[in-house]
Amino acid sequence: MNEIYDFYNNGAEIGRLERGLGIVEFHRTKEILSRYINGGKVIYDIGGGIGMYAAWLAKLGNEVHLIELAENAVEYAKANMMQDCHFIAEMGNALEVNRPNESADVVLLMGPLYHLRDRGDRLQAFSEARRVLKKSGLMVAAGISKFGSMTWALSVYGEKNDFIDDPVFFNMILGEMTTGDHIRPTEYPKFVAESYFTTSEEMKTEIAEVSFSVEKAVAVEGCIWFTPHLAEKWEDEASRERLLEIVRITESEPEMMGMSPHFLVVARK
């Protein structure tokens, strides 16, 4: 847990959604959330990092509570909060949410689940989300695909794709694909801290186990993220819309879900 805390406390999220694939992730996540959330909701953004989604949702007219484990991330969120998107930001833990029963319209778990390698902890996080949700309240949970690193290593994304020839990297992705456990090698200090990578089916099963009604799973970046020269195409409006149309059409196809680095599962209490 210290590795995870230090990773985020040292600013891992600062700028991440404003560069590279983070831009696609941010755009698509907002697009998906917009289908369910407009304004006037009480939203608990649990594990929401530096508040990128919290700020956006607050600007839409929601009462947003950012509850984040890393102290420096909370302080960054407070220091960079704009007047027109005010939200509550405080330290907290997804396993023990400091909020009353049935007090939120929406709970976002778009960060904590990556780092709960113990299944019991993941079920506890889902149970806490259900506890604080009002009747028929919405939960959106994010997962990282256990095939993401493997797909990245084999893809045309980036300039060099010789990772599978590195035994250290290869052993890392073998662990991810077979057990879901991501153990960051010391040779790759900028990789995400120790995590649990999963599948949408596994996450849906865990969510249903704590009596949520699972509505659907949606791929975030989908199959477009390894497009050659993605950054250039994304800057071109016509190309960007074509890419987005592709991912929208395929976003719920089970056969495509594992190709997406991130996915969201939508559920109701």
Where in the sequence are the language-model features?
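C-terminal lobe and adjacent flexible extensions of AdoMet/dcAdoMet transferase-like proteins
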Residues: 206, 210-269
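Acceptor-substrate binding/catalytic loop of class I
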Residues: 116, 187-202
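A short glycine-rich, Lys/Arg-flanked "PGG" loop and its adjoining helix->strand segment in the class I
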Residues: 123-135
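Class I SAM-dependent methyltransferase SAM/SAH-binding core
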Residues: 44, 52-96
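A short SAM/SAH-binding and catalytic strip from SAM-dependent methyltransferases
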Residues: 106-120
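Conserved class I S-adenosyl-L-methionine
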Residues: 1-39, 44, 52, 56, 138-176
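A short acidic, Gly/Pro-enriched loop at the edge of an enzyme's catalytic core
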Residues: 95-107
